[in-house]
Amino acid sequence: MTPIQNAQQIFNRQHKNLPEITVYAPGRVNIIGEHTDYNDGFVMPCAINFGTAISGAIRDDHIWNVYAADLDETDEFSLNVEIPKSEHKWANYVRGVVKFIQERYPHFQQGANLVISGNVPLSSGLSSSAALEVAVGKFCQQLGDLPLSHTDIALNGQKAENQFVGANCGNMDQLISALGQENHLLMIDCRSLETTPTPVPQDVAVIIVNSNVPHDLVTGEYNTRRQQCEEAAKFFGVKALRDVSVEQFQKREAELTALSPLAAKRARHVVTENQRVLDAVEALKNNDLTCLGKLMEASHDSMRDDFEITVPQIDYLVELVQLVIGKSGGARMTGGGFGGCIVALAPHDKVDAVRKIIADNYEKTTGLKETFYVCTASQGVRVI
């Protein structure tokens, strides 16, 4: 059963009524451009065919009653008083989104009953949190008939995660969940918010493999990386590392390394990664999978050696995939790091061989069982 069917059926069962509003927002996978979004840089994700659905109906008071079907937990809060934090982590994503929509539209105090159901794996780096934030934002927009664009909904979700949940994420995850296009990757300029759709080549599969090494960005080292990038930007006298070219970085690399070796390594990743995203757009335009594969490999090496966010299990998965696909595609870690998933672009006729080499070796070597997905690039948030 899909999340949409699940949310609708459970709502019907709980409230003896059909839902008035159903919305759906997808998770995402980032093909290239990691930890560049909060440096005002470039990213190239696609929305995937896993996501979060919300079914709901209006109430005649100011209360939101929210049931998370997959966790079997309920949260309840009022919209006509200051919204406090919940002890349930998932509930804070919902509360944060509503709180910041109320900041924009103080008259928005409409109560509702909601059922949430999703199939984005939690803590996998596929943006279950952004899918939830964008779905809640779209639900609010429909419920209150609010003049919110999909970009507004995305940025509101990011604000909720930064200021209410406490994860200092960039804006990529929410933007792609809101703006994704079917069968396209979306190059996003995280400063101007300009998007450039790039078709996924027809003969290419988007493969995601979850290492099942869990990660938690709020308590992890994500925020430290962000501080190190800000330190490097200050050294270059710019607003963000987006404003430093590869040539400019190389000229002053030794000077920065002497001052702060770690900030220099982090900056080298971000500056070169931004260039790799721009090069990847060209490679895809030219249907040059060999070039794209090299860029993805360089991106992974940079995350491993300079940004230091991969773990041995992830490195091993990438090695296994590269053995099979060779020069006909690419593989790299995707997401915040410290666990999560790898992404590969490979010809459809290599998918079974990739699945087999991982099934034969990964669990035997690491003691962890992988989860294997073949995804399609999907449309962003929508009303059902």
Swiss-Prot record:
One of its GO terms (molecular function) is magnesium ion binding. It is an enzyme of class 2 (transferase). Its EC number is 2.7.1.6. It is found in: Cytoplasm. Pathway: Carbohydrate metabolism; galactose metabolism. The active site is at 173 (proton acceptor). The record marks 28 as: Transition state stabilizer. Keywords: ATP-binding, Carbohydrate metabolism, Cytoplasm, Galactose metabolism, Kinase, Magnesium, Metal-binding, Nucleotide-binding, Transferase. PANTHER family: GALACTOKINASE-RELATED, MEVALONATE KINASE/GALACTOKINASE. This is Galactokinase. It comes from Haemophilus influenzae (strain PittEE).
